[in-house]
Amino acid sequence: MKEFDLESYDYDLPKELIANYPILPKEKAKLLVYERRSQKITHTTFEHVLDFFPKNALVVLNDTKVIKARLFGSKHAFLPSKTTEVFFHRFFKNNTALTQIKGKIKVGDKIFFDAHYYAEVLELLHNGQRLIAFYGNKTPLNQENILKLLEQYGHMPLPPYIKRADESLDAHEYQSVFAKHMGAVAAPTASLHFSQNTLEKLLKDFKHAFLTLHVGAGTFLGVETKDIREHQIHTEVLRIPKKSQEILQKSQEVLCIGTTALRSVEYFKRLENPNQEAFECDIFLHLANPILHVNHLLTNFHLPKSSLLMLVSAMVGLEKTKEIYQIAIEKKYRFYSYGDGMLIL
């Protein structure tokens, strides 16, 4: 069936529609509103986004914070040029970290960030991942100090389709105004559309709940299996505070800010008796595993053959999604992380 065929999720996007910079002020970004019941499409801007939110809906937001996950160092302490890139993915046990390292590397290699700080390769894992430990003055760093190291020496992990180096503006624009808990290596991009003023109005006028899904580097990996149902999606760290859990359990109508919030809600609501706050989220939503517990979604326009495009198709239908995306292309909407948005009602 074509809805499970990977090629059905391909489309052509003119390169000039890939957003390399955000629209400022945020309210000027374009917004496509699609009402599923009437199939009506409205073209507006984020200045009016809250006008379309259903008054009784619970709005769910992901408050993860992007860390400066890209580090550059040298394999020799005395070399001033830093050409070896270390991409921090997530913490592992005993204060070690899962990373990707560009170029040839072997167990025991050290990568120096300055005269005091370096990383040592402990193990070569599958999928190109490397297990490393960080050191300061030859002493192993704990997670708190690793985060300080990343903040001091790291670069914002812009997506691979943004063909430029990170700049000073990315430190705050590739971060939602409600970002709180450090751990993501990619931004939950629908959240980037909210200015402080819009957020304050949302929190004042709507029921809301926060959760934390630390977006992993796997979010940029395309689906590669010919039958999308065979795809194994990446696992991400999820935390839902008890207060938010209670609100979610009572809510009948849910609007999620972004696919990460939606996946988190769907994962949580399918658990029989959740009795903890921390989870490992690995839910893959598509037409054979449809959305059951979320009614509305604010999202960006996603990459061809991506699991996120399949999620949108699970909500809207494959043909309607392709039709809407074609309209967005014709109307010159800007795509991907720094692009415009789409509200599905």
Predicted feature locations:
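Surface-exposed, charge/polar-rich loops and edge strands
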Residues: 1-345
